[in-house]
Structures are given as C-alpha cells and as structure tokens.
Amino acid sequence: MKLWGGRFTRTTDRLVEDFHSSISFDQRLYKEDIAGSIAHARMLAAVGLITPAEGEAIIKGLEEIRADIEAGRVTFDVGAEDIHMNIEKLLTERIGEAGKKLHTARSRNDQVALDLRLYLKEEIPAVKKLLAGLQQVLVDLAAQHLQTIMPGYTHLQKAQPVTLAHHLMAYFEMFYRDQQRLDDCLDRVDVMPLGAGALAGTTLPIDRELVARELGFKAISANSLDAVSDRDFVVEFLAAASLIMMHLSRLAEEVIFWSSEEFGFLELDDAYSTGSSMMPQKKNPDVAELVRGKTGRVYGHLMGMLAVLKGLPLAYNKDLQEDKEALFDTLDTVKGCLMVFTPMLATARFRVERMRADASRGFAAATDVAEYLVRKGLPFREAHAVVGSLVLHCLREGRSFQDLSLEEWQSFSPLFDNDIFGCLEAEACVNGRNLPGGPAPEAVGKAIERAREILAGIQAGLSR
C-alpha cells in the first residue's frame, strides 16, 4: 500500500504511476533529502517527539541508505513515486517502526522545497567557480594582449580601433555581473522552508530554528503558504543561467566568425575543433557552435518555468514537479558549457598581425579626425560633416586617409596641419583614449588589476 493510501479503496492505475512518478529524475536529490531528514530527526528527538534511541536509529539508517545509493546498491521503485518516499520506504523496511516516525510534522511539500534549496546552495557556488575559471582565462589573455590592436565594431562594421585586451575585458564585466546575480540568487535560496508542512505548518512543538542551524540556512521562511509554493528562487537561477548562456553565446559567436578565413583573427586548437566527414580541408568550431545552440535550450527552461507558475493558486500544486527537470538540465548545460569553453579559449591562438592590419584598413580613425578638429575649435557637428565629406571623397577615388596630402586635407578645412598624420595610426587612436573604461593599454591595465582583485574576492568567498 502507498504510504499515503489510507483513504483509498483502489490501487493507483499503472499508467498514472508512471505518469506521476518523478524518481527517474529527482533521485539526484538523494543527498539533500537525506541531509534534511537527518536534521529533521535530530530536531524531533531534541523536542521529544521521538526518543533519542529512535533518532539514532533513523540517522544511522539514513546514513546507510546514502552509502548504499552511492555504491549503486539501491534500485529505486517507480511505485514509491519520488526520492522522498523511496528513502522513507527503504528506511522503514530496514529499521521498522521508528522509520514511520520520520515524517512527523513534515510534508513532502516542505520537504521538496527544502531539498531544492539545499541542492542550489551547493550548485550555485559550483557554477560560480567554473565562471571564475573562465574569467581568469579572459584576464590572463587580456594581460598578454594589452598592445594587440584590433578593429572595434558596431553593426558588425569596422568602427574604431581597440585592443584585444579591451575586447576580452568586456566579457569579464559581463561575467562579473553574472557572478553578482548568482550571489543575489543565493541570498534568496538560503531560506529554510521545513516546518511549513503541507501548507499551514503543524500543531506539534517543532523547532524550526534548530533545523535551520543544523543545515546551515541563514533564515527560516516567514509564511508557510509561500514556503511550499515558492519557486521564485528556481526562476531566478534559470534567469541568471540564461544570462550566463547569453554572454557565452555572444563570445561563441565571435569565436566562430573570428576563426573563419574571412576574419582570420584566431585559430582554435585541434583538440577543440572538429572536421568534416566529406570535406577534408575543414576545421570547424563545433564547441562554440554547440554553446551557441544550447543557449536556446536554457532560455526554453526559463520560459517553461514561468509558464508553469503563472496560474498556480496557493499553495502547493503538482505542477511544481516540473521545476526539477528544467533546473537539473539547466545546471548540467551551463556547467558543461563552462567546462569546455574555458580551455577552448585558453588554447586559442590569436593572429595579432592580421588583427592589426585589419584595424588600419578603412576609416577607423574618422572619429579621431573629427575630434582633432574639435580640439582646434570647430563644433563637433561641423567637424562630423567635414570628416564625412572626406570619407566620401576617399571612397569615390578609391583612396584612404593615409593617401591624402596635406593640401588635400586643408581643402576640406584650413584647421588641418601636419600633426593630422599622427592621428591616423591605429596605435594613436587607441592610446589617445586613456580614460577610465577606455581601450588604452594603461586604462586596460588598471581594469585588469581591478579584475584580479575581484577574482580574489570571489575565490575567497567560495573558500568560506
């Protein structure tokens, strides 16, 4: 008979059992479920709801079940529905009547909420650690390429010269915001729901604070209805994960076209590339493409979870079972992408001369020329028009700024002098932008110092 079967006269239809069961995926919560049950048992013994001997028997039994699961000696029962009932069933079979007392003052509703929070309390730092590893690679590469000039783009059109270091540090900042979002999410995960019961708590004299201390939670939930129905923390994590994947996908997209012959800015290591079954010459950036593709998968989980929650009345509803596969797959996807993307980027070889040459082509110095005129006293809008006319003139004649004589420059504005030629070099364009947040090597060097301090703080936080 089901552990909840007292009021039923017929057994559950087999189709319903299969449809209803979540053990195929929620079994990964066994550690959290057992940890929560051990803390609950200690509390029950401490307040006198079970005897010390019963508490010891329950804890010993749970520890043995955990060891057996880890050793692969446990076969889960679909008929027991989920990880909670499977463990309770195993416990009762092993220790007898004491096992039946474990669920005193507890519901699966607050139990599963607890398990998910415990799970994320472990998994979020794991994601942060992987993310910090990628950030470290970005910082190290940036430090190597402070002087590497490359084109900066808007609308995927060459805009102004920057450095590869500056470009890479832009991604450091994106991932730093992701770190902050994960910290923020973890704050709201770190609330202990056990004691909320099915929805309205219990009349029994439990000690919720004791359980929270035992499990390392910083707070207990303030409302029992909210505690069992809240999955905001899951949505928040899925949203944070979606942003991580978005940033990975943006970088992946650049890796993909940078590694093409058309750009030729980098070459991926053979270990992180694949070939073609038909075309012998091909070297494909499949890792980056898969990261880009898997981003949509994570977005889908976020949208799906929002759709699950949008119409749920208080308190618990079975719809909430849909949270786990979305959460688990998102975690697996994000961690997997970070694990493979980091060494792929670390082993990539940047073609410095190709980047430098591309940065010098075209009219990337146009803004610098306009600002040259501004420094000479011309209003910016007039300077903009003058330089636009210069660009049009060069395009019509198939020439570049560097091809123009001083007389030709002065035919567009008498403010041009010999010093204009010093403004046209890509290095001058970059070095002239030595402002906080700018691409000049000195400014990027300071950004790298700040980034190293940030990473040290993240690592210190993960070590606590």
From Swiss-Prot:
The keyword Plastid appears for this protein: no
Gene3D superfamilies per UniProt: Fumarase/aspartase (C-terminal domain), Fumarase/aspartase (Central domain), Fumarase/aspartase (N-terminal domain)
Broad enzyme group: lyase
Membrane spanning stretches: none
Pathway info: Amino-acid biosynthesis; L-arginine biosynthesis; L-arginine from L-ornithine and carbamoyl phosphate: step 3/3
Biological processes, Gene Ontology terms: arginine biosynthetic process via ornithine; L-arginine biosynthetic process
Pfam families, per database record: ASL_C2 (PF14698), Lyase_1 (PF00206)
Catalytic activity: 2-(N(omega)-L-arginino)succinate = fumarate + L-arginine
EC number of the protein: 4.3.2.1
PANTHER family reported for this sequence: ARGININOSUCCINATE LYASE
Name used for this protein in its record: Argininosuccinate lyase
Organism in which the protein naturally occurs: Moorella thermoacetica (strain ATCC 39073 / JCM 9320)
